[in-house]
Amino acid sequence: MTYLPVALTIAGTDPSGGAGIMADLKSFQARDVYGMAVVTSLVAQNTRGVQLIEHVSTQMLEAQLESVFSDIKPQAVKTGMLATTEIMEIIQPYLKKMDCPYVLDPVMVATSGDTLIDTSARSYLKTNLLPLATIITPNLPEAEEIVGFSIHDPEVLRSEERRVGKECRSRWSPYH
């Protein structure tokens, strides 16, 4: 019997299906990967913007993580919208003890421009989750938030990419 590789997404929802766990699960399926999901936040949004965000309770978040990690061990984990420090503090121990690739998508702002993460969580992400990541997938505004300044020059972008890459736990990088 052949089993599919297993990946876990830990993120918020997007009822339009264009982002969040819905998009992650579609991507997993398109690549013949068995996808699992832990929901961090329920987001009411569409192409015009974010209407409402409600974070799951800490008890529910912990129960979802424990359910997944105590049974079907993921072979890769991707995080998306982790909107608060409290959410990140619950997730971090699971990320620290796993031995598989970790993709960090530092979701900070919706495509519509709406803020999706609070200020203290931005700092926590950079200090505590970034070093655990195998790879990070920021867009330009998120990359600028991570490095702390605007990036207008492609050479500066490559230089910062190298520097940040060295801070991650990546086993392979073109810059190592």
Named regions from a protein language model:
Residues 12, 105, 139:
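Active-site glycine-centered loops adjacent to acidic/histidine catalytic or metal-binding residues
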Residues 32, 73, 99, 133-134:
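Residue-level detector of structured alpha->beta connecting loops
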